[in-house]
């Protein structure tokens, strides 16, 4: 079958790869003008995805991870208050993204193509683009266009993401930016700090080129802070060029006012071991934490995956792995069907996936509230 994917981030690329592996003609349409390299931080290794790719002849060494060995909590003075053994393998968003791109036929990736509208009939879907390019027909369209999905809004009018009451300041900074003594306690551990209405965590991820060598790796950090005033969120989401972003501001695009706020808050409110990470980060970025859940993960010949289907709180550590599970399960569901069975198969797949993520949708807000983050439950 011919399958079109709207959105070329990890969820869209993962679907493109699994569906290509199972014999479909797949094309990805990404609105950004070029590749999205360097736009994310750490991610948990996608074990199910790796198994699937290896079964289909792809080497996945580029998704290697830095293991953390302990989960350590510290206080404002840097003293360890809790220290538990825990092995967690972390890769990086850009390493996973680059690896997925490298395994896809270059001709299947189309940048600078934003889907404007779709029209479905009994035989397929016609896709129109904002730039006025010739429409494309496909047997199936996969919406992988993120938390603020335009396609989800078109399919289910009135359905929108809802702000959860807190934000995540984020960044990555090279391990070799520091004297090794200064960061010795942060290396190969997950280090966390909690105070009223905020939570900071950091861990190592591979270098931008995928290297795991000591000194070449990067610290990934996340700082969750309550920001219940939505007018403040609007200011933070307004980038240096005056553009108001929907839910996140990419690296290098924070306004001078937001950067000044971040640096002052880190200096005043974080342990020295952690504030130095923030101060040394050249291009921090921002994510407003939101909840989104599509009424269904499919409608007709259109399927929704990744954050377009539902947005999980980052505390679950499941956002990227959910995208991988979406991709693998969808490829398996579509592996042997005929064109006439598409709608029924997508309906069954959608019900299965929605049921699978239901526990994670409940877990995220509970974890946030246990840290004092977000709006209280009603």
Outline where the language-model segments fall.
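Extreme N-terminal starter segment of soluble prokaryotic enzymes
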Residues: 1-3
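Conserved mid-domain beta->alpha element of the FAD-binding
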Residues: 7-21, 25, 142-143, 169, ...
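Conserved Rossmann-like nucleotide-cofactor binding loop
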Residues: 11, 34, 148
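Glycine-rich FAD pyrophosphate-binding loop
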Residues: 20-39
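Active-site-adjacent segment of FAD-dependent monooxygenases/related oxidoreductases
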Residues: 33-103, 371
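Conserved FAD-binding catalytic core of PHBH/FMO-like flavoproteins
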Residues: 62, 79-80, 87, 91, ...
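Contiguous C-terminal substrate-recognition/catalytic subdomains in enzyme active sites
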Residues: 233-286, 290-291, 297-298
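C-terminal domain-closing interface element
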Residues: 370-378
């Amino acid at each position: 079958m011919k399958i079109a994917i709207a959105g070329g981030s990890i969820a869209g690329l993962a679907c493109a790869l699994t569906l290509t592996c199972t014999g479909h003609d797949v094309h990805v349409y990404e609105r950004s003008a070029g590749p999205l390299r360097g736009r994310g931080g750490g991610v948990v290794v996608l074990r199910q995805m790796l198994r699937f790719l290896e079964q289909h002849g792809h080497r996945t060494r580029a998704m290697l991870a830095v293991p953390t060995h302990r989960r350590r909590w510290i206080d404002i003075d840097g003293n360890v208050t809790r220290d538990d053994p825990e092995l967690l393998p972390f890769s990086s968003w850009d390493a996973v993204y680059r690896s997925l791109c490298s395994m896809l036929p270059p001709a299947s990736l189309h940048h600078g193509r934003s889907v404007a509208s779709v029209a479905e009939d009994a035989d397929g879907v016609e896709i129109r683009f904002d730039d006025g390019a010739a429409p494309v027909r496909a047997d199936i369209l996969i919406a992988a266009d993120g938390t603020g999905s335009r396609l989800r809004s078109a399919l289910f009018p009135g359905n929108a993401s809802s702000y959860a009451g807190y934000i995540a300041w984020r960044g990555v900074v090279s391990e070799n930016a520091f004297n090794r003594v200064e960061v010795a306690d942060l290396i190969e551990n997950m280090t966390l700090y909690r105070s009223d209405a905020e939570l900071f965590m950091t861990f190592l991820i591979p270098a931008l080129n995928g290297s795991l060598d000591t000194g070449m790796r990067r610290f990934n950090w996340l700082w969750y802070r309550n920001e219940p005033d939505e007018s403040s969120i609007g200011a933070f989401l307004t980038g240096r060029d005056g553009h108001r972003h929907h839910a996140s501001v990419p690296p290098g695009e924070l306004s001078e006012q937001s950067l000044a706020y971040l640096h002052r808050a880190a200096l005043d409110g974080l342990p020295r071991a952690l504030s130095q990470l923030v101060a040394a980060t050249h291009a921090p970025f921002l994510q407003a934490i939101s909840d989104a859940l599509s009424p269904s993960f499919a409608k007709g010949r259109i399927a929704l995956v990744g954050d377009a289907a539902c947005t999980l709180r980052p505390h679950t550590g499941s956002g990227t792995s959910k995208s991988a599970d979406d991709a693998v399960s969808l490829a398996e569901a579509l592996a042997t069907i005929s064109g006439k069975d598409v709608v029924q198969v997508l309906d069954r797949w959608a019900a299965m996936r929605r049921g699978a993520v239901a526990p994670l949708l409940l877990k995220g807000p509970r974890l946030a509230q246990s840290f004092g983050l977000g709006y209280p439950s009603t």
